[in-house]
């Protein structure tokens, strides 16, 4: 199990990313627009740098929804490989069965 503080930190990052999403997209649009003046683009870069670091979506970590495990998480289920296997063996995931050939 992951520490509660690590789970809480990830939740905080998700909320911050949602809060600053529109602002971040607008600034990135200005930066990548070739029709913007160099001064406008530079101002946008500086404003983007002043945003909180944790508001960037790339700082979020995929974690298991049950255990908080950061590695081996299957996006389709939102669970770690261990919990997916346990649930599949109990028949709790419809349509998923153990491979046999």
Swiss-Prot record:
<dbReference type="InterPro" id="IPR018271">
    <property type="entry name" value="Ribosomal_uS14_CS"/>
</dbReference>
<comment type="function">
    <text>Binds 16S rRNA, required for the assembly of 30S particles and may also be responsible for determining the conformation of the 16S rRNA at the A site.</text>
</comment>
<protein>
    <recommendedName>
        <fullName>Small ribosomal subunit protein uS14</fullName>
    </recommendedName>
</protein>
<dbReference type="GO" id="GO:0005737">
    <property type="term" value="C:cytoplasm"/>
</dbReference>
<dbReference type="InterPro" id="IPR001209">
    <property type="entry name" value="Ribosomal_uS14"/>
</dbReference>
<dbReference type="GO" id="GO:0006412">
    <property type="term" value="P:translation"/>
</dbReference>
<dbReference type="GO" id="GO:0003735">
    <property type="term" value="F:structural constituent of ribosome"/>
</dbReference>
<feature type="region of interest" description="Disordered">
    <location>
        <begin position="51"/>
        <end position="70"/>
    </location>
</feature>
<keyword id="KW-0699">rRNA-binding</keyword>
<keyword id="KW-0689">Ribosomal protein</keyword>
<comment type="subunit">
    <text>Part of the 30S ribosomal subunit. Contacts proteins S3 and S10.</text>
</comment>
<dbReference type="GO" id="GO:0015935">
    <property type="term" value="C:small ribosomal subunit"/>
</dbReference>
<keyword id="KW-0694">RNA-binding</keyword>
<dbReference type="InterPro" id="IPR023036">
    <property type="entry name" value="Ribosomal_uS14_bac/plastid"/>
</dbReference>
<dbReference type="Pfam" id="PF00253">
    <property type="entry name" value="Ribosomal_S14"/>
</dbReference>
<dbReference type="GO" id="GO:0019843">
    <property type="term" value="F:rRNA binding"/>
</dbReference>
<comment type="similarity">
    <text>Belongs to the universal ribosomal protein uS14 family.</text>
</comment>
<feature type="compositionally biased region" description="Polar residues">
    <location>
        <begin position="52"/>
        <end position="68"/>
    </location>
</feature>
<keyword id="KW-0687">Ribonucleoprotein</keyword>
